[in-house]
Amino acid sequence: MEYNTSALCDIYMDQVDVVEPMFSNFGGRASFAGQITTVKCFEDNALIRETLEQDGVGRVLLVDGGGSLRRALLDGELAAIAEENEWEGIVVYGCVREVDELEDMNIGIQALASIPVGAAMQGVGEVDVPVNFGGVTFLPEDYLYADTTGIILSQEPLSADLEEDEEEPELLD
């Protein structure tokens, strides 16, 4: 399904938080949305792998990597695991690598930048905790919508049907 964050903001401005514009697209899917699962880690991607090995249908992985530009938290191998487990997308407040592989995958991926240096795999970090970056606090189970224009967050699912004439719009679960 395609999502348009500009249209969603026009309709739901009082219900959404807008993440500061700092992310670039790296995945093969231009827009994505889902209920978030958070991972907070710094230059270590073991918990990211563990989380991506779970069923990802209807989910977006939101990674707070502390904004580090020194090591990539996501690479082609981890993105392939995410794609295999049907994650909708991944947002990394940090870096990715192997960007040519990432852009060929059917998954949304946004991150600050790319760097060839990989992350450690010590398992240091936390899962499903509130995280804050980009002027927004992300809570586990919030709903994230992303496209090439930006990223927005809502506590409730937003209508997938942007026709204003509909009496009862279909909600995303």
UniProtKB/Swiss-Prot annotation:
GO biological process terms held by the UniProt record: regulation of RNA metabolic process
Subcellular location: Cytoplasm
Protein's UniProt keywords contain Zinc: no
Pfam families per the UniProt record, alphabetical: RraA-like
Family: Belongs to the RraA family.
Xref: HAMAP family: RraA
Listed NCBIfam families: NOT-MenG, PRK09372.1, RraA_entero
Subunit-level organization: Homotrimer. Binds to both RNA-binding sites in the C-terminal region of Rne and to RhlB.
Purpose of the protein: Globally modulates RNA abundance by binding to RNase E (Rne) and regulating its endonucleolytic activity. Can modulate Rne action in a substrate-dependent manner by altering the composition of the degradosome. Modulates RNA-binding and helicase activities of the degradosome.
Record's protein name: Regulator of ribonuclease activity A
Organism: Vibrio vulnificus (strain CMCP6)
Organism lineage: Bacteria, Pseudomonadati, Pseudomonadota, Gammaproteobacteria, Vibrionales
